[in-house]
Amino acid sequence: LFEDLLQRHLEARGYQVERVMNLTDVDDKTIRGSRESGRRLADFTAVYKDAFFQDLDTLRIKRAQHFPAATEPRYIERMIAMIQQLESQGIAYQAEDKSVYFRLSKFPDYGKLAHLNLEELRPTGRIANDEYEKESIGDFALWKAWDEKDGDVAWDSPWGRGRPGWHIECSAMATA
């Protein structure tokens, strides 16, 4: 709703707006749902994508002009290139589990806008049960190593088969 209101406001002020909205089509939840339903990932997420568009139309919310999907080959390639660049700068690292993580310790001001103190972070249930190995509690996955629970949802990369993490998806699509 916010994006719709902002777009309408800017257009009323004479600005030309080109809006892009990522519809997450690969993450832990979609893979799990796909597996549990016995459907291919693309078929599973298509149902939710269609319902989302119907909701937009029902509420008369303006659609974005572009809806990129993280699973498009050009974005997967972009994500891999971005992770390689971060890795070469020491900002990303591959852990023992073969996943690649973003090293938050390289950014002392991370969380400043949200008034977060990284030293005071404690694991939540989700983080405590995280299946991935990382240097610090705040580090997040850029590339998740393939796991048999992922089924056929994986791409080849310099770190082995795996899939993108949520954060890098948006970064790659926003800068493509």
Give the ranges of each region predicted by the language model:
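NTP-dependent nucleotidyl-transfer catalytic core
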Residues: L1-A176
